[in-house]
Amino acid sequence: MSALTISKEDEKRVKGMGFLNNRGTDLFSARVLTVNGKVTAAQHHCMADAAEKFGNGNLLYTTRLSVEIQGIPYDKIEEFQAFIAKEGLVTGGTGAKVRPVVSCKGTTCQYGLLDSYALSEEIYRRFYEGFQDVALPHKFKIAVGGCPNNCVKPNLNDVGIIGQRIPKVTVNSAKAAKNAQLKQHVQMVLPKL
């Protein structure tokens, strides 16, 4: 393993572009962004080709649903970015910024209670893309879960959205009217949605 020969300033600069140093070398791992982990077949082929052409041939998936391509030489970073840009792919997702938004598969999952793809894509556009020039004190993570099963762990993020079923409460139903005790205890006003 060769030692790191580039300056700390250059290392910091490319980290801001989504390239993390592979310990003790002049090689980097590129964080290729996805929206909710969704990529087209053509984008997948492009990343696989880029991994073989510029890196060590491996694709790794991060907890924030980005794709990491390891082993890219420092002097090939710009060429790598141009190569993946042909399929609309970009690198990023590092530093003290809003991180890529993650969501579960709630849109298509049998337990999903909301359209987690659409909501997280809107949040991604507004906050990840919209706040890229905003310096934060620390990384800021957002997750969207389609139901309380907690697959994507929204509660472990800085902002977590969890789909919930909204019960329909009918206080004056025939059953409630027959049960005076229930009628006394169910005194609530629900907002209209």
What are these regions (language model features)?
Residues 1-25:
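Intrinsically disordered, low-complexity polar/charged tails and linkers
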Residues 4-6, 30-170, 175, 179:
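Small-residue-enriched alpha-helical segments and adjacent helix-cap loops
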Residues 22-26, 166-170, 186:
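Short, ordered beta-strand-loop transition motifs
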Residues 179-193:
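Iron-sulfur cluster-binding cysteine motifs and their immediate structural context
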